């Protein structure tokens, strides 16, 4: 007995000590990383102080001494605010502002007369050490998981250091100072571009780095200090391209959730920047040396640039109009926790973004061509504006590209509920006895409420929910289904997915039992679908809560020319009534909707003893399905809806770009592998890409 108690006590003590060591190891690791950041900051402060001291010693400029002493005084105040008054935000803001100012001041002071001085060489090595420590600290923080990525465009540290650097540039002449201030704005745009993971962010980073050390930008006076400022600011957003796990809408949240007026003003502000760049490009016409090349080139590509950027601004304006509509719906359905992703998908934002991505690409191409034609290597203001415009348009292209890739397609749904539980000898539904009417009405109402909840949660446009106790005739159902299957979005194209729900009596072979002895076969429904779908690539998903859905599930697997899925239910025939209630129509709908609308559900479709099991089948080409891509006619309709006639000639260029199909060999191989997977290893849970899943037990 004593041995057992001693063993239990020693075992518990060992576990406690092991856990304590793990906690201490984590704390020590976190502290080490934090101290590494402090070391990088202190090293940078020493480098700045030594650099300013060398310049004061060699030039005897009293302004340097005044700023040096003032800088130390401000940093002392920041330390007092931090340690004695616990004003961390004010202290860090003040210190970051002065770090940016002092580093900028160090950049723009001439050191040509004492480049080989020992103290100046020490300053350079200290700055290089600061770069290495800063990169190492950021990398270790992210690899250890100590960084919490939050949606932001610019952090407070980045903004204040950029402002401080811009203020330091005012010590130069007005023209040179303006050039540097614009360069700082361009650097801020590049940081945002990297943090948003734009498709063209890395090429923009390369272009910025190549152009950064032009003499007209006043960087060569102290390129090491300039490189230190640039790399320290770029490190975090550059590493976050890999380490950040934020989704598209999370990254763009500061912009997408901005107020309506602010987003509209951003379009106006973008237009002013673009116009300024065009005016600065026109200064190239003063160059009479190559007038025979410059004048024709600027005239042709300038007109092309103007047309493309009119389209660009109208595209941004149209995007914000659709986004405002999405915010209205989001505000209305706030209690239902509808995410902006689903709302944008339901409003056809994916189709809009796919077309807009191509149009913005033309704007980027036009800017690159105009910049090359009107290149002015000695004009720092032109170069800075060029570096502002590129990431600005790159961000717009990246936003449309990512939203077009991640958003689900549009969908529309139609539900039919025929509450009949008893059948005549010939298999036709009959009216229920009065004592069962109330129970059946409650169950049918529950099915209607569940499917309406499903449509609302997944932002599926509702065509209708028909409830009929006497059944539907074949002609009535024919007219309703044809009207449902030919529905289109507001922008013109067909919906990506059509969801048809049916709960009612079926025959043993799966046909729907209709009023008057009529039936609806799957072949008949497919014929109507082919007639309405035509050459489009929409999907039809049929959800059956009936006693005989298995025949349709098996039959749909033989279809080869359409994208169709059938989600059905299997009800256990033999069951011990003492252990569980017999399955009824509506039980599957309740569980399936709860599974797809509640992320914290505990429904397990494969558990033993389930009275209602799930089964689904898909057509042979189901895995080939991709969301509807804009066709030539879609682009033409989009053009007529949003843009003036003067821009119509570009529609042919847009259609040509839509028709490009690069990497077709890789896509073909990947398609074959997915077909094999769906035919041989049908997954237990199949994501439809619309937010809900098909399941099988």
Curated annotation (Swiss-Prot):
GO terms for molecular function: sodium channel regulator activity. It is found in: Nucleus membrane. The chain crosses the membrane at residues 36-56, 63-83, 89-109, 151-171, 172-192, 199-219, 223-243, 265-285, 293-313, 352-372, 380-400, 646-666. The keyword NADP does not apply. Glycans are attached at residues 111, 337, 533, 598. Its main location: nucleus. One of its GO terms (biological process) is regulation of ubiquitin-dependent protein catabolic process. Keywords: Glycoprotein, Membrane, Nucleus, Transmembrane, Transmembrane helix. GO terms for cellular component: nuclear membrane; transport vesicle. It is a multi-pass membrane protein. The keyword Cytoplasm does not apply. PANTHER family: TRANSMEMBRANE PROTEIN 168. Plays a key role in maintaining the cardiac electrical stability by modulating cell surface expression of SCN5A. May play a role i the modulation of anxiety behavior. Belongs to the TMEM168 family. This is Transmembrane protein 168. It comes from Bos taurus. The gene is TMEM168.
